[in-house]
Amino acid sequence: MINFLMKGVVSMIVEAIEKYPLLVIFMLVLLLVMIFVIVYYRMSKKYEKSQIELKESLLAATTLNRCIHALTYHSEIDDAINDLLCLITEFFQGDRAYIFQIDYEQNTTSNLFEYTEEGATPEINNLQNVSLETIQYWLDRFKVDGTFYIKSLEEEVDKNSETYRLLKLQNITSLIAVPLIENEIITGFLGVDNPRRRYDNSSLLSSVVFFVSESMNRKQQEQKLKAMSYLDSMTHIFNRNALIE
């Protein structure tokens, strides 16, 4: 039966070629053109996608280099970190970027640095000595995933949780954050509120946190040395440097 049908189809094709050779040639050319267009379209889409990915990678690398430069060449660490947060906010097109430090002895975390875009409300004064219980969900996610990412506050976070309450008060609908780690202990975190672009790309933040930790450690050492310079090594009371200051 199949052989009979195949013979019938072949005979019809042969008959069509004999009767309408130009039409058959036209149809074949049209088919080849369609195949070429489809292949070209798919290749152009792949090329366009690869170009976008390359552009994004170059932008991330450039931003990382600028962040490292800011941390390395600024004489004032506070200014350096502020510039870094500005660059990160710009990269993600967020409302604000910030650094929190954890105090395990007091069981609290505090906002040490914050950069806010125009139109965004500063929150640093409202986020001092926050109970670690409030961000326990964050810490758990840091330990499991290495990042903390919320695409939609309303859809992803329990409305009865402390995390929801805290973020809702700050008009935060989405965020991305990565932990600061020292000796395998989470000492704080770096985050961006309401990122409008690249919100699912934590690679830049993950690359930056090492240099941020180093800069913050350097600042702590400088503060310790400065404090020591104010005390007499024998009596441990304030010396001339403290009086001058």
Language model features by range: what are they?
Residues A70-L112:
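Helix-loop-beta substructure at the N-terminus of cytosolic sensory domains
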Residues H69, Q223-E245:
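Conserved nucleotide-binding and Mg2+-coordinating catalytic segments in signaling enzymes
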Residues L31-I38, R42-Y73, L225, T235:
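Signal-transmission linkers at sensory-effector interfaces
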Residues T173-I181:
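A short, aliphatic-rich beta-strand micro-motif
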Residues R196-N217:
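Amphipathic alpha-helical "output/dimerization" segments
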Residues G188-R198:
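Short beta-strand-to-loop transition segments that serve as allosteric relay/switch motifs
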